[in-house]
Structures are given as C-alpha cells and as structure tokens.
C-alpha cells in the first residue's frame, strides 16, 4: 500500500508542478504617471514614468496613448519607439505628439490657464521570450501647466 501512496503523491506533485504558470504569463500592467507635457507650434512632447511591478523585465515593442486634458479627449498618439522596463524598476519615456494632437493640446491649455489634469490611457505591446505579444493596459494621470 505504501508504494502505491508514494507513487500517487509523486504523480500529483508532478502534475501540479507542470500546471503552474510561468512568471512571464502572469504579468501585471506597469504603473504609470504623467510627469510632463510641453507643447508649442505644432510640436509637443508627453513624458510618462512607468514602474514595472513584475519580477521579469518588460520589452514594449510599441504603444498607443490616448491623451485627455481635463474632461476633453485631445487625441491618440502611436509610438513605435521601444520601451525597456527592468524587472521591479522604473523608466521615464518621452512620446512625440503628432501635429494635430499638439495643436489640440496647445489650444486647450491656452483656453484653460494654470494647472490642468492630464490623463493618458496606454496600450503597451509587450513581446514575450517566446515571441508572443501581450497587450498591457494602464491609465496614468498628472498635473500639467499651460505654457
């Protein structure tokens, strides 16, 4: 009876070990914060700070950001620049605004002087070690000042 129980215990342990999810497949989206917005004559730069809560690094191939100022949607920013987030680390990333988004942001900031709440909804395309793509979504906020 003992060998039977031992073989059942070993089999169960192997099955449970084989069913565990690798750390990379249990990814949390990074925490994000808007740290700056600078706009001028049809140009602009949005600065975001990302904090990776995962025990594995994140390789973001590309990202899409939707910018809102106050309660107004300003526009969508597609960013093809890669972002490397070290495990449990932080990175500051700057995103160049398309001309239409920069113009809309500048018009909003001129009409609303002082500090304005900026909200950015980001979709981050992470490439896993197996070359799969996982979309991580996060929302960041911060106060920005009119020029």
Regions found by a protein language model. Give the residues of each.
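Sec-dependent bacterial lipoprotein signal peptides
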Residues: 1-19
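Bacterial Sec signal peptide processing site at the extreme N-terminus
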Residues: 15-36
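Residue-level preference for beta-strand/loop junctions
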Residues: 26, 42, 59-61, 89, ...
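Short structured motifs
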Residues: 30-35, 48, 77-81, 104-106
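Post-signal-peptide N-terminal segment of Sec-exported extracytoplasmic proteins
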Residues: 35-76, 126-136
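Hydrophobic residues positioned within well-ordered beta-strands of beta-sheet architectures
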Residues: 44-46, 63-65, 93-95, 116-122
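Intrinsically disordered, low-complexity Pro/Gly/Ser/Thr-rich segments with frequent PxxP/GP/PP motifs
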Residues: 69-105
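Terminal connector regions
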Residues: 101-147
């Amino acid at each position: 009876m003992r060998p039977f129980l031992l073989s059942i215990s070993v089999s169960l342990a192997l099955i449970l070990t084989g069913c565990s999810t690798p750390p990379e497949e249990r990814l949390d989206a990074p925490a994000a914060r808007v740290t700056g917005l600078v706009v001028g004559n049809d140009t602009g730069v949005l600065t975001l700070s990302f904090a990776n809560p995962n025990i594995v690094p994140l390789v973001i191939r590309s990202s899409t950001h939707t910018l809102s100022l106050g309660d107004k949607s300003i526009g969508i920013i597609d960013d093809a620049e890669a972002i490397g987030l070290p495990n449990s680390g932080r990175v500051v990333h700057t995103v160049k605004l398309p001309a239409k988004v920069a113009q809309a942001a500048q018009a909003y900031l001129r009409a609303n002087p002082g500090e304005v709440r900026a909200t950015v909804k980001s979709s981050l395309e992470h490439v896993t070690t197996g070359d799969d793509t996982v979309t991580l979504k996060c929302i960041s906020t911060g106060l920005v000042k009119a020029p």
